[in-house]
Amino acid sequence: MSRIYEQIEKDVEKIIGQYDGDKNGEVTINEAIEFFKRMGSKYPEKCAIVLFKMYDLDNEGKISYDEIQEEIFKRYQDKVREDQIKQYFQDDIEAFLLRYDKNRDNRIDFKELEQCFESIGSDHPKENANHIFTEIDKNRDGYLTIAEIKNYCRNTIRSKPYYQS
């Protein structure tokens, strides 16, 4: 993990070096506009404004090495968290299929799901299975596929207030 952070630091130094016209370690809005002009941007002012909205964390009108590094680290950590969540659900889906896909066709039919609820002691296994099928079986073919389950989990996570992408 530390090699990744070292690479991010090197990349941030390159970024600052490209934008920082007077080489003082900070980038002003004018330096960013000049950089985008040199790069041939049709909209250098707009590009600079977007850059500053992303990285001028303290709204001082200049971007420092620390601000860029902090934002890149934050985005990297958010990506790692998202990848961990995806892996968690992938593992859960596979374990669910291994346990309840009795005929090993890589999908769950209504009866298999009903038996799943029975095995965990549900008082209303048929109603629970029906509810799940209504929510997840989007093509109404009578089977829950890995893709449908993943899609449902992904949409459910994104609708929660604690998840930010």
From Swiss-Prot:
Keyword tags: Calcium, Metal-binding, Repeat
UniProt-annotated binding residues for Ca(2+) 3: 101, 103, 105, 107, 112
Binding site for Ca(2+) 2: 56, 58, 60, 62, 67
Binding residue positions for Ca(2+) 1: 20, 22, 24, 26, 31
SUPFAM superfamilies per record: EF-hand (SSF47473)
Residues that bind Ca(2+) 4: 137, 139, 141, 143, 148
InterPro entries noted in UniProt: EF-hand-dom_pair, EF_Hand_1_Ca_BS, EF_hand_dom
Pfam families linked to this entry: EF-hand_7, EF-hand_8
GO molecular function, a single term: calcium ion binding
Sequence ranges assigned to domain EF-hand in this UniProt record: 7-42, 43-78, 88-123, 124-159
Protein name, as recorded: Calcium-binding protein H
Organism name: Dictyostelium discoideum
Lineage of origin: Eukaryota, Amoebozoa, Evosea, Eumycetozoa, Dictyostelia
